[in-house]
């Protein structure tokens, strides 16, 4: 069953008197439980497409159905509810609040969801333990390595039990060992919890952890690659 379906979407911007087409008629369908990558050179439309999938932006034309809802027809508040309740975001930069502990950073989405008291703390702690950070819950970001900070960011993304995780260059700021660790976590979340994952990456090794690769060029899908195995194993 499709979690999301995009049909012939475009995204156009005005830069002064010039109209820029970031996406030019993109169509794709992603099933529940799939792990897919979006690859392409700079300026190919990868981040624009991810922003639309994540309800951070809307297409100029075309349709986008997520969880049975026509996203392009929703109001800002309805889009915010979908982002908060159904989508987890992981970025290249960790975006952790520096004056909050790992636990407090992970609790933030639950505050917005109206989860209070002991339940909020227990869920945040469980999310951190699931990525191997049970002994770092009271550490501040500056007391952790880059890989550990990205694991906190992943915990924050999954603590609300989303159906979809969107990752934009999630290993871009990490060394090779930390990158491998992060990708193994994503793969486990996909395999064991059935979370759908869509990631943007420039790195072939990272894309190999998924099941399918959408190759973008000049705002269009150039071809779709189906992978036989995951993680290069």
Question: What is the meaning of each model-derived region?
Answer:
Residues 213-225:
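H-loop (His-switch) and adjacent beta-strand-loop-beta switch element
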Residues 1-12, 222-233:
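ABC-family P-loop ATPase nucleotide-binding domain
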Residues 3-216:
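ABC family nucleotide-binding domain
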């Amino acid at each position: 069953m499709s979690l999301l379906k995009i049909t012939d979407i475009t995204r156009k911007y005005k830069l002064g008197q010039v109209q820029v087409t970031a996406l030019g008629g993109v169509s794709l369908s992603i099933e529940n439980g799939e792990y897919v990558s979006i690859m392409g050179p700079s300026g190919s439309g990868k981040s624009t497409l991810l922003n639309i999938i994540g309800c951070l932006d809307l297409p100029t034309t075309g349709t986008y159905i997520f969880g049975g809802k026509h996203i392009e027809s929703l109001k800002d508040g309805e889009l915010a509810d979908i982002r908060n309740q159904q989508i987890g975001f992981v970025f290249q930069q960790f975006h952790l609040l520096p004056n909050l502990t790992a636990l407090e950073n992970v609790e933030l989405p639950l505050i917005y969801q109206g989860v209070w008291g002991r339940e909020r703390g227990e869920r945040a702690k469980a999310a951190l333990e699931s990525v191997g950070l049970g002994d770092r819950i009271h550490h501040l970001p500056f007391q952790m390595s880059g890989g550990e900070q990205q694991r906190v960011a992943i915990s924050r993304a999954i603590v609300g039990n989303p159906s979809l995780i969107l990752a934009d260059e999630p290993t871009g700021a990490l060394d090779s060992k930390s990158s491998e660790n992060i990708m193994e976590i994503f793969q486990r979340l996909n395999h064991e919890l059935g979370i759908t994952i869509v990631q943007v990456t420039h790195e072939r090794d990272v894309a190999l952890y998924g099941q399918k690769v959408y190759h973008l060029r000049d705002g269009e899908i150039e071809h779709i690659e189906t992978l036989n195995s995951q993680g290069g194993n």
